[in-house]
């Protein structure tokens, strides 16, 4: 808000003697809104006492206007009723102490927890007179104690902004915040003053805290404008100057060196240091010894530190040097100072040269321990008739805080001391405390700047450079304080008032009485006076006495002021505790409610009246608080009345009323609070005027550490600062007027010419003031800042002489660019009389310089460095480049002379030349031949002693320097891989090779002809081929192929191994980088193979050389060393009765053509309870295009509890067209924990012919990890009747790490005709990439009943890239009861493109994982009746042609109990665009508990309409923890022909991990009746052409209870385009607790009518890359008993079945290799009839 203006102060603002030892404070008109800010701080006592001078003192009397005395008012107001109320106004007379203004010191920034009250410490404001108005209402301002008479006692301010907008709205002016910035900057500046500075400028701390000014209202009702705070702030510079660099003040000191000392130095060294330091200060020479002796006499030099010596020097130098009135203090200070008889004190002058010493120690420290406080007292300034220990704060009563102090002489500029106020007391009176204060001496000099911090309730004083000029400083102060209304809130309560001055505590108890008349209808008080914003904040309590008027109107009037619109607020009191006695209500608490808008206070046009119509609001007992703000408008007392009547008038005849009035009175009534006047800043810049033109140029920097003093028009010092690092200074809080600015002239500097430019902002304004060591400039402030008062100094001219001492390598006496300086050369400077005046040595660059020379003639002498000879002198015409010899004369004339240089040379020579690569081996350097770097060259003297070594540089050059005449030997070390070329081949010694050892002669000149050439030593290779000699003739035939992986060892002729390798996939091997010589090559025979005949042919490159071959290399490669092997034959007749449980993991890549005609009748009943905990990491990129047509009718009852957190990013493109009709009932309980770690790298090539007739009954548990490359022809005729019922409860913990690199090539033709009646449970987890043309005609009737309880925790890391295009028609009728517990953590990145067209009617439970690469022709005719439980994990890559005719009748009842614990991490990025239209009628009852923690980044949109009532009860007893880490690199190529007739009864448990590339022709005719429960996990990549005609009638009952806890992290990138038509009729009752985070984008058309009575538990993980042509017509009823007698010629090592290690028995279970049926864990079969929701 706008400040009230006041013109310049034309009266003197000093003290007039009033009576002995007292000073009355002159009163100034500061405006009616001002309040007595506080008494000024004074020093000393009586005439010798330095007192804080307060410029403006306003005394306000606080009056309580009331018709009677306090007691009378009580009774009277209690009797008032609304009908005939009486108006009473209490007046409090002005307090006498207002006349005698106490020096108010702003409390320091110490730690008082209270809010920052803005203390207006009177002491500080020299510029602005402090007004001492203490508005009677409670005013918290520290310095002033204006007296206001208020009917009600002042309301205290609470810690929180209790008076909210009205009381807290005031804020400090922007100028103050600006001050704050400057304060911090000044602090910075002061620390960087030149060497002389004491580090902290006086205003430093003041600036730092100045921001507190801005929140003066923080916890107080309203911030008060501090009358003196602005002047007290001394800004050293403006913010804009922060970035400017600091001028180095070292220029002000002489160049003479001062010895360095420490505490341990000797007394003599310390005395020398003292003498040198004193001399460097520029003290008069006749005083130097006196100061040095004084330091010696007054200090114990033996124990003294450098810091103590510096302090002693400063003290003594001050005594000697500060004798001229540089600061306008023409008489000794009124402070008590010790007068040294040797150095009487006169006025002080600044010393730039002292700053280096003064700045060293104690910069900016708290010196409370060095401020001695005596006679501290806390007394009551009583102005009313009451007990002496009672204070009436609202009647303008305050505390007086007095003390004397004495400053230790070690205190320096920037040091601080504090005054900390206790919990219940704060500085100031009714006014809000001023933030800025000053301590002044009697003559007006600023001793310290104070800053009050409301948050800590502390004033911190920062000493100015005043303390550096004087010693034995003593003083006293008298401060005003008041109870802190935020904490001392109750009337008639005893509070301890405590203040800590420096380290001295003064404490006294007082009873506080605010005079809150609780029996009055209207009670009011001035809460505080805010000088910053020029307003009085008033608080009114209404209906505090429960008068409950039926109709009431409130109005208030003011004289000599006006109400501020918008600052009248009404609060409804919800708790009477809000009406605190201190009149400092917390308006932010829940005890009050802002209802201003409800009553809409009205302010009159002239601002002198406020009206609020409460109507009937008080009739029910409501109480209200009104806050209002008054801005003084005149020079008289501000008088406010507060009325509560029935009609809003003062008519006393008809209505009773409640009234109250307050008056803020000012002594003399003519002054205005200084804080209301606008203030400005004055300042600018002191700079180093290098070009002495009196104008600031861009490259000229500021001078730090220059003392600047501000004086008023009466020559009274107002403020003083020191320029900051960038040379800036600033004085703040100045009113309009003309001021004098004095700049102390730094030593060794001269003032620049004044007013040399028309631009006043950049010229120099200072002019020397006679003989005084200051320059003076005038600055005028006229309603704006004046930032143009600046001055320049330049260094008093001194000149330099010097230049350069260099090594004149070419001895021409001229400095060349490549010639370098010589360091350490002694140079002597003599005057014209020949006296030595300086010596120096050249630096590392050969430079030297003598500085600080006056005009005159000098002689410079150069000492010849050892080993050098002076070069020619004055050889050139360029004086700056020639040599002046060892002695020369120089004349200095108003300029530096940098031409005096001297050259020397060493009489030594160089030897060297070049080492090159002689590519054409002719011993002559050709232009195209390049140097060889890094060749070691050794130099020896004539006695053969090595005197130097070096290596050739990047270009092949080398050189030895500094050699005297003589004969030398040069030896060149042959570089690795090189051979020396011919020596001395040509006539030109500069281009021929001198060989590896040669002699070089130096005779008065360099010899740069010694060179040597080398050429690269040739390297050769040996190797060839290891092949399979199928016809065993020892000769490589074109159709015979290489054998990979054969180990080949290279040895030297002594048999030491040099290297080993293995043949590549083609059987090739090679050893490189061999020198000529004899070698041995050894071939290690591959397992299962026999060495072929050696050296059987005439062609060495075609025959076999045997296993150990001796080879001689002579200047050429040898690629004829090869060897051949052929396969062993085995004939085995085995009779095996096997009970095997097989778990096979195969990887098959099959290209099959299948034409199948199957007739299947299956009845399966499966009860599956699966608990899967899978953590998978898969990176799949799938592109699937699916077009599906689903007609499903499902009846499911599901109770699922799923907690899934999935983050999947899938990009899938699927087109599926499916038509399925399935009826399945599955109950699966599986618990598998597998942790396998397999690293297999096998390469086997087996050619076996086996004719096996075996009758085997085997109970085997096999774990096979095989990599087989088999080429077999088998003809098998098997009749097997196997009835296997496996109830397996497996707990497998496999930790496998798989890194597989497989090459599979399969080509298969399959023709099968099958007629099957199967009752199967299939759990299939398949990942298929199929490109199939299938024409299938199948007739299948399946009824499957499966009870599977699976608990799987899978940890798989899969990276799949699949393309699937599926078109499926699905008609499914399922009734599923599933209870699954799956914990899967998958991270999959899949990009799949699948196009599948399948028509399936299946009730299967299959879990197959197959990876197979087979090329087989199978013709099998089998009749089997098998009841098998198979868990097959196969990964098949097969290219098979199969013609099978099978008739299968299978009845399978599977109860599998598997617990799989898999941890998979899948990274899948899927983009699914699915368009589904689903009509589903499903009835599902499922009870699933799924805890799935998957991290999937999926972008999917799913639109699904399902009604599922599924009750799945899963009995899962399986524990599976699978962590697989497998590193398999297999390359298998198998061609097998197998004819087998087997009769086998097998119960097998096999865990097989096979990677097979088989090319087999199999003709099998099987008739099988199988009751199979197959759990197959297959990974197949199949490209199949299938022509199948199938008729499938499937009736399946599926009761599945799955509990799935899945933690998957999948990042899948799939493009899915799914167009599905689903007709589904589902009835679902699901109780699911699902916490799923999924984002799916699916556009599906599904028309599904599924009533699925299908008990199928299908967990299929298949990765199939199959290209198959399958024509299958199978009718199988098989119970086979197989007796096989096999004779095999196997190329590859067969899988290790765990039987034994004999290689001859490894071909027995060829069928087991492909089956891979593993560890299907069977549990109890359970079907739940009662559905569980």
Curated annotation (Swiss-Prot):
Propeptide, chain numbering: 1698-1733
Name of this chain's protein: Serine-aspartate repeat-containing protein F
Family named by the database record: Belongs to the serine-aspartate repeat-containing protein (SDr) family.
Region (Ligand binding A region): 46-678
Pfam families named among the record's database cross-references: Big_8, Gram_pos_anchor, SdrD_B, YSIRK_signal
Residue ranges of every copy of the CNA-B domain listed in the record: 679-797, 798-907, 908-1018, 1019-1129
Entries under PROSITE patterns matching the protein: GRAM_POS_ANCHORING
Biological process per Gene Ontology, one example term: cell adhesion
Species, as recorded: Staphylococcus epidermidis
Pentaglycyl murein peptidoglycan amidated threonine modification, residue list: 1697
Location of the motif LPXTG sorting signal: 1694-1698
Biased composition (Polar residues): 85-99, 146-168, 186-226, 255-266, 336-346
Ranges for region Disordered: 51-269, 332-351, 862-890, 1085-1708
Known role: Binds to type I collagen via alpha-2(I) or alpha-1(I) chains, although its affinity for the alpha-1(I) chain is significantly higher. Involved in bacterial adherence to transcutaneous drivelines from explanted ventricular assist devices.
């Amino acid at each position: 808000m706008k400040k009230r203006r006041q013109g310049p102060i034309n009266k003197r603002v000093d003290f007039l003697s009033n009576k002995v030892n007292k000073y009355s404070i002159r009163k100034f008109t500061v405006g009616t809104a001002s309040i007595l800010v506080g008494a000024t701080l004074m020093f000393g006592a009586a005439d010798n006492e330095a007192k804080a001078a307060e410029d403006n003192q306003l005394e306000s009397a606080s009056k309580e206007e009331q018709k009677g005395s306090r007691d009378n008012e009580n009774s009277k107001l209690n009797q008032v009723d609304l009908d005939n109320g009486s108006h009473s106004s209490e007046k409090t007379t002005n307090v006498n102490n207002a006349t005698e203004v106490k020096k108010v010191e702003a409390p320091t920034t110490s730690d008082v927890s209270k809010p920052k009250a803005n203390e207006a410490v009177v002491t500080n404001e020299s510029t602005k007179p402090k007004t001492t108005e203490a508005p009677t209402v409670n005013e918290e301002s520290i310095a002033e104690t204006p007296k206001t008479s208020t009917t009600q006692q002042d309301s205290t301010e609470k810690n929180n902004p209790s008076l909210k907008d009205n009381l807290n709205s005031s804020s400090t002016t922007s100028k103050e915040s600006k001050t704050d910035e400057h304060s911090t900057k000044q602090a910075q500046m002061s620390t960087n003053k030149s060497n002389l500075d004491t580090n902290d400028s006086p205003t430093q701390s003041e600036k730092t805290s100045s921001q507190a000014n801005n929140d003066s209202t923080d916890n107080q009702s309203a911030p008060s404008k501090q009358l003196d705070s602005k002047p007290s702030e001394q800004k050293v510079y403006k913010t804009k100057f922060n970035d400017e660099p600091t001028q180095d003040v070292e220029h002000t000191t002489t160049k003479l060196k001062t010895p360095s000392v420490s505490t341990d130095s000797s007394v003599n060294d310390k005395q020398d240091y003292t003498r040198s330091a004193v001399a460097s200060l520029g003290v008069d020479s006749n005083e130097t010894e006196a100061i040095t002796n004084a330091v010696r006499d007054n200090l114990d030099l033996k124990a003294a530190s450098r810091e103590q010596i510096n302090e002693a020097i400063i003290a003594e130098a001050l005594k000697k040097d500060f004798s001229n009135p540089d600061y306008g203090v023409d008489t000794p200070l009124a402070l008590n100072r010790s007068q040294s008889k040797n150095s009487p004190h006169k006025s002080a002058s600044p010393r730039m040269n002292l700053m280096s010493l003064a700045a060293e120690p104690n910069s900016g420290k708290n010196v409370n321990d060095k401020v001695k406080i005596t006679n501290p007292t806390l007394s009551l300034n009583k102005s009313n008739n009451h007990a002496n220990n009672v204070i009436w704060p609202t009647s303008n009563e305050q505390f007086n805080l007095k003390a004397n102090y004495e400053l230790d002489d070690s205190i320096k500029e920037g040091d601080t001391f504090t005054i900390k106020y206790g919990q219940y007391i704060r500085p100031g009176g009714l006014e809000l405390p001023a933030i800025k204060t000053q301590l002044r001496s009697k003559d007006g000099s600023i001793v310290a700047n104070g800053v009050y911090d409301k948050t800590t309730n502390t004033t911190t004083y920062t000493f100015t450079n005043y303390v550096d000029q004087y010693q034995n400083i003593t003083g006293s102060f008298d401060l005003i304080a008041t109870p802190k209304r935020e904490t001392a809130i109750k009337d008639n309560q005893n509070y301890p008032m405590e203040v800590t001055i420096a380290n001295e505590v003064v404490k006294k108890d007082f009873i506080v009485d605010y005079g809150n008349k609780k029996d009055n209808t209207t009670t009011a008080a001035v809460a505080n006076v805010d000088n910053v914003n020029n307003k009085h904040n008033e608080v009114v309590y209404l209906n505090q006495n429960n008068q409950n008027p039926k109709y009431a109107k409130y109005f208030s009037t003011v004289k000599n002021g006006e109400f501020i619109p918008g600052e009248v607020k009404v609060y409804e009191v919800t708790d009477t505790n809000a009406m605190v006695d201190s009149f400092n209500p917390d308006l932010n608490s829940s005890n009050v409610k802002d209802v201003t808008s409800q009553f809409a206070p009205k302010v009159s046009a002239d601002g002198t009246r406020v009206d609020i119509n409460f109507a009937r609001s008080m009739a029910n007992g409501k109480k209200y608080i009104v806050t209002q703000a008054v801005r003084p408008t005149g020079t008289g007392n501000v008088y406010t009345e507060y009325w509560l009547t029935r009609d809003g008038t003062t008519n006393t005849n008809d209505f009773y009323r409640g009234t109250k009035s307050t008056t803020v009175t000012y002594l003399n009534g003519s002054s205005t609070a200084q804080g209301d006047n606008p203030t400005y800043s004055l300042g600018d810049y002191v700079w180093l005027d290098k070009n002495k033109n009196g104008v600031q140029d861009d490259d000229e920097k500021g001078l730090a550490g220059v003392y600047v003093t501000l004086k008023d028009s009466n020559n009274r010092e107002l403020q003083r600062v020191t320029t900051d690092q960038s040379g800036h200074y600033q004085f703040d809080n100045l009113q309009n007027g003309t001021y004098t600015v004095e700049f102390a002239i730094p030593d060794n500097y001269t003032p620049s010419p004044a007013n040399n430019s028309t631009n006043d902002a950049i010229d120099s304004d200072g002019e020397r003031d006679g003989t005084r060591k200051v320059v003076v400039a005038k600055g005028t402030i006229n309603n704006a800042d004046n930032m143009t008062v600046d001055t320049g100094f330049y260094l008093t001219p001194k000149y330099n002489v010097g230049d350069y001492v260099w090594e004149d390598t070419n001895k021409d006496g001229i400095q060349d660019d490549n010639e370098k300086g010589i360091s350490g050369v002694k140079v002597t400077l003599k005057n014209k009389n020949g006296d030595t005046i300086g010596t120096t040595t050249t630096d590392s660059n050969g430079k030297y310089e003598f500085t600080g020379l006056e005009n005159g003639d000098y002689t410079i002498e150069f000492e010849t460095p050892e080993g050098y000879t002076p070069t020619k002198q004055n050889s050139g015409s360029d004086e700056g480049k020639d040599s002046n010899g060892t002695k020369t004369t120089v004349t200095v004339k108003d300029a530096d002379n940098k031409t005096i240089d001297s050259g020397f040379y060493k009489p030594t020579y160089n030897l060297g030349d070049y080492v090159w690569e002689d590519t054409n081996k002719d011993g002559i350097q050709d232009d195209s031949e390049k140097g060889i770097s890094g060749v070691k060259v050794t130099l020896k003297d004539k006695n053969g002693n090595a005197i130097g070594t070096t290596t050739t540089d990047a270009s092949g050059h080398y050189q030895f320097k500094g050699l005297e005449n003589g004969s030398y030997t040069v030896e060149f070390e042959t570089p690795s891989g090189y051979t020396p070329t011919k020596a001395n081949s040509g006539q030109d010694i500069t281009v021929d090779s001198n060989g590896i050892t040669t002699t070089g002669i130096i005779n008065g000149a360099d010899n740069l002809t010694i060179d040597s050439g080398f050429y690269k030593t040739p390297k050769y290779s040996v190797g060839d081929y290891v092949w399979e000699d199928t016809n065993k003739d020892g000769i490589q035939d074109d159709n015979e192929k290489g054998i990979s992986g054969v180990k080949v060892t290279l040895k030297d002729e002594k048999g030491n191994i040099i290297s080993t390798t293995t043949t590549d996939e083609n059987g090739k091997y090679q050893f490189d980088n061999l020198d000529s010589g004899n070698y041995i090559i050894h071939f290690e025979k591959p397992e299962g193979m026999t060495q072929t005949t050696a050296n059987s042919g005439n062609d060495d490159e075609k025959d076999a050389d045997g296993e150990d071959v001796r080879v001689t290399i002579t200047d050429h490669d040898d690629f004829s060393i090869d060897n051949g092997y052929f396969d062993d034959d085995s004939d085995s007749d085995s009779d095996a009765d096997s009970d095997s449980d097989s778990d096979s993991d195969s990887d098959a890549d099959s290209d099959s053509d299948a034409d199948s005609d199957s007739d299947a009748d299956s009845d399966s009943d499966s009860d599956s309870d699966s608990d899967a905990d899978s953590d998978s990491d898969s990176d799949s990129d799938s592109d699937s295009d699916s077009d599906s047509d689903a007609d499903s009718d499902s009846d499911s009852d599901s109770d699922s509890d799923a907690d899934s957190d999935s983050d999947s990013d899938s990009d899938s493109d699927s087109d599926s067209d499916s038509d399925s009709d399935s009826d399945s009932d599955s109950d699966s309980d599986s618990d598998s924990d597998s942790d396998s770690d397999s690293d297999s790298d096998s390469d086997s090539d087996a050619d076996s012919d086996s004719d096996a007739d075996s009758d085997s009954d085997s109970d085997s548990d096999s774990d096979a990890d095989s990599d087989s490359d088999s080429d077999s022809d088998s003809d098998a005729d098997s009749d097997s009747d196997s009835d296997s019922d496996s109830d397996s409860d497996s707990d497998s913990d496999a930790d496998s790490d798989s890194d597989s690199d497989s090459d599979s090539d399969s080509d298969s033709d399959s023709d099968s005709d099958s007629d099957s009646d199967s009752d199967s449970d299939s759990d299939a987890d398949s990942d298929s990439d199929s490109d199939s043309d299938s024409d299938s005609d199948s007739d299948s009737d399946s009824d499957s009943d499966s009870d599977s309880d699976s608990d799987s925790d899978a940890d798989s890391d899969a990276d799949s890239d699949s393309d699937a295009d599926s078109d499926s028609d699905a008609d499914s009728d399922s009734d599923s009861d599933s209870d699954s517990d799956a914990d899967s953590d998958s991270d999959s990145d899949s990009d799949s493109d699948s196009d599948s067209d399948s028509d399936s009617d299946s009730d299967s439970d299959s879990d197959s994982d197959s990876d197979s690469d087979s090329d087989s022709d199978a013709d099998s005719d089998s009749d089997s009746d098998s009841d098998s439980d198979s868990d097959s994990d196969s990964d098949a890559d097969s290219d098979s042609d199969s013609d099978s005719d099978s008739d299968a009748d299978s009845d399978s009842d599977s109860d599998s109990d598997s617990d799989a614990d898999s941890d998979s991490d899948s990274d899948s990025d899927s983009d699914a665009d699915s368009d589904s239209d689903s009509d589903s009628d499903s009835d599902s009852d499922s009870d699933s508990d799924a805890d799935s923690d998957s991290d999937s980044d999926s972008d999917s949109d799913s639109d699904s309409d399902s009604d599922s009532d599924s009750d799945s009860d899963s009995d899962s007893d399986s524990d599976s923890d699978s962590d697989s880490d497998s590193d398999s690199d297999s390359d298998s190529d198998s061609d097998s022909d197998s004819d087998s007739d087997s009769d086998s009864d097998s119960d097998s448990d096999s865990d097989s991990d096979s990677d097979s590339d088989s090319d087999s022709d199999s003709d099998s005719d099987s008739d099988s009746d199988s009751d199979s429960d197959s759990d197959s996990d297959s990974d197949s990549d199949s490209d199949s052409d299938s022509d199948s005609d199938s008729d499938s009638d499937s009736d399946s009952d599926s009761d599945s209870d799955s509990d799935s806890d899945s933690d998957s992290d999948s990042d899948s990138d799939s493009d899915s385009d799914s167009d599905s038509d689903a007709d589904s009729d589902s009835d679902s009752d699901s109780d699911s607790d699902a916490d799923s985070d999924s984002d799916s984008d699916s556009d599906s058309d599904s028309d599904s009518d599924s009533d699925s009575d299908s008990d199928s538990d299908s967990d299929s993980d298949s990765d199939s890359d199959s290209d198959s042509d399958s024509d299958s017509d199978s009718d199988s009823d098989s119970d086979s008993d197989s007796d096989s007698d096999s004779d095999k010629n196997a190329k590859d090592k067969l899988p290790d079945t765990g039987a034994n290690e004999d290689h001859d028995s490894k071909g027995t279970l060829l069928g087991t290799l492909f089956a891979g049926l593993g560890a299907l864990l069977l549990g109890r079969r359970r079907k739940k009839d009662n559905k569980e929701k």
